[in-house]
């Protein structure tokens, strides 16, 4: 008899690895150059001033400063304000140095 059994368990039971997408730094948090602010698929959030856009649409900080989210024409935009970051970035580096 040329029939298959009805179990089908070998076709099920797969799952993809977690991609850990989302906002990594929220508004008014301090960032240093190169820190990831948003991991996303596509440009749900657009890059603003002092941030870069990676080829996988990751938004990262290009300078030290404070993260700022805003909306323009119904589009979310993230930027980094440099005026606050200079003093705080030095403090973060000192704190991380003492933590190790």
Curated annotation (Swiss-Prot):
GO terms for molecular function: structural constituent of ribosome. It comes from the Eukaryota. Keywords: Chloroplast, Plastid, Ribonucleoprotein, Ribosomal protein. GO terms for cellular component: chloroplast; ribonucleoprotein complex; ribosome. One of its GO terms (biological process) is translation. Its main location: plastid. It is found in: Plastid, Chloroplast. Belongs to the bacterial ribosomal protein bL27 family. PANTHER family: LARGE RIBOSOMAL SUBUNIT PROTEIN BL27M, RIBOSOMAL PROTEIN L27. This is Large ribosomal subunit protein bL27c-1.
């Amino acid at each position: 008899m040329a029939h298959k059994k009805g179990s089908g368990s070998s076709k099920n039971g797969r799952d993809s690895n977690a991609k850990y997408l989302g906002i990594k730094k929220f508004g008014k948090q301090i960032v240093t150059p190169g820190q990831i602010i948003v991991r996303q698929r596509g440009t749900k959030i657009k890059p603003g001033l002092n941030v870069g856009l990676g080829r996988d649409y990751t938004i990262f900080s290009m300078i030290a400063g404070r993260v700022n989210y805003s909306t323009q024409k119904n589009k979310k935009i993230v930027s980094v304000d440099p005026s606050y970051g200079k003093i705080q970035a030095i403090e973060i580096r000192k704190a991380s140095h003492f933590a190790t």
